[in-house]
């Protein structure tokens, strides 16, 4: 499912996409995806893309409830110590196992991404250290009581140490280091134009709905609407307010607020 986190907005989509039977979904977006590096720039389009390629220890539902991500469970052991258990059998897109050591690497990387214009370090400000208990168990020590730690970790995409240890942001953008554990794998990123994803069939026990997903950057509102009406794309975001009545009246289309 294509999800967008953040402020409420509207989507217009072709009714043909609703049963999710199509093999290829194309979405035209108002704002560009600027990087595949999930720790480089905290911006809504980048976060939306990262939801599909990477996973977080803890995820959020559409109603902002916390739900298991890479972690199947978490609990406080004391006021300044949390235990997280990773999902057995979780794998990266290259087939390698996701381990607690990848989480340690991720937490160390987040505040140290070179030239980041606005990253995610603030979400980890309470973390003092992480202990690997075994490959699927880790203990996170905090500097002070941190009851919101699971909520903060819902913002942090976990990346592979193997592929990220020597990688720069450019290596994520090229695809070399963009090896996630999410439902889709990154196929191609053309900055200012499009991002292409392909389904990862090894994700959990679930099969993602579309085989391929393309995000196109179309900043002109009229161009997005025209592309939708012509059938060139299946979904657009932020349709012009003046066009919403017309789009709602078209039986081939649906308009939704998220």
Regions found by a protein language model. Give the residues of each.
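Ligand-binding "clamshell"
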Residues: 23, 245-258
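Surface-exposed binding/hinge segments that line
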Residues: 75, 121-163
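N-terminal signal peptide c-region/cleavage motif recognized by signal peptidases
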Residues: 15-19
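Aromatic- and charge-enriched surface segment that lines or borders ligand/interaction sites
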Residues: 72-116, 139, 224-227
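Ligand-site clamp/hinge motif
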Residues: 200-246, 258
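N-terminal lobe/hinge region of extracytoplasmic solute-binding protein
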Residues: 28-78, 108, 115, 177-180
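Short, well-ordered beta-strand elements
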Residues: 23-32, 72, 81-84, 103-107, ...
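Gly/Pro-rich hinge or "lid" segments in bacterial periplasmic/extracellular proteins
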Residues: 154-208, 212, 222, 230
